[in-house]
Amino acid sequence: MRQIIIAGNWKMNTTLSEACTLVQGMKYELDQISGIQKIVCPPFISLAPVKTILDGSSIHLGAQNLFYEEKGAYTGEISPLMLQDICPYVIIGHSERRAYFGETGQVVNRKIKAALQAGIMPIVCVGEKLEENENGQTRQILETQMKEALAGINPSSIIIAYEPIWAIGTGKAATAAEANNTISYIRKVLGDIWGNTASRITPILYGGSVNEKNTAELLCQSDIDGALVGGASLKAESFVSICRQAADVRK
């Protein structure tokens, strides 16, 4: 059985002091929750101090992005080598990176390769826009994104996150059945690329307005292995509640 993973993507939120306060406010409660993987992804400047706070904790740390080169004249970028000793996870290919910073499937692919080379597990994001969903293009878009992201990469330890763009930060989530149906298709595409064994063991998360009210229903679905949580991860009590519900699903 695939382990449930709950990852909190803080995006461009929290100052350094706010990040430390937030993680301190959830650390004790999260450490009481077992049977699931818990990940928090604060902004880059907070990674090191948050890591110190989480030392010895069951909570894992992730970055929100990286660049595909190890070092050099790439002003403002963060390399895999810089993250290697700080966090075991990194989000790659989030729709906001694709939309605001022009990240293509080829760039996402290079970043995944760089993360794996550095021993960092990528959380690879895929998802369709509202108009693509309404035009019946969801499967086509997701298949293209998956094939571009994993081109030339052998079966590896990765996490996939399905985030329908129309549901991110809008309060409008896919129904549990819709999300499960789409994730089942993503798993089929992964099987076509990497084979059935890799498809069966790779965790696929749902993201997009995940909150305390819809978590349990989402995680009861057969193909949904967890959640990539946005806004609700910025409140300690909400994130703890989501993680607690996730653990209860597997009891």
From Swiss-Prot:
Pathway: Carbohydrate biosynthesis; gluconeogenesis; Carbohydrate degradation; glycolysis; D-glyceraldehyde 3-phosphate from glycerone phosphate: step 1/1. GO terms for biological process: gluconeogenesis; glyceraldehyde-3-phosphate biosynthetic process; glycerol catabolic process; glycolytic process. It is found in: Cytoplasm. GO terms for cellular component: cytosol. Keywords: Cytoplasm, Gluconeogenesis, Glycolysis, Isomerase. The active site is at 94 (electrophile), 163 (proton acceptor). Its EC number is 5.3.1.1. It catalyses: D-glyceraldehyde 3-phosphate = dihydroxyacetone phosphate. It is an enzyme of class 5 (isomerase). One of its GO terms (molecular function) is triose-phosphate isomerase activity. The keyword Cytoplasm applies. The keyword Isomerase applies. It holds the Pfam family TIM. Belongs to the triosephosphate isomerase family. Homodimer. Involved in the gluconeogenesis. Catalyzes stereospecifically the conversion of dihydroxyacetone phosphate (DHAP) to D-glyceraldehyde-3-phosphate (G3P). This is Triosephosphate isomerase.
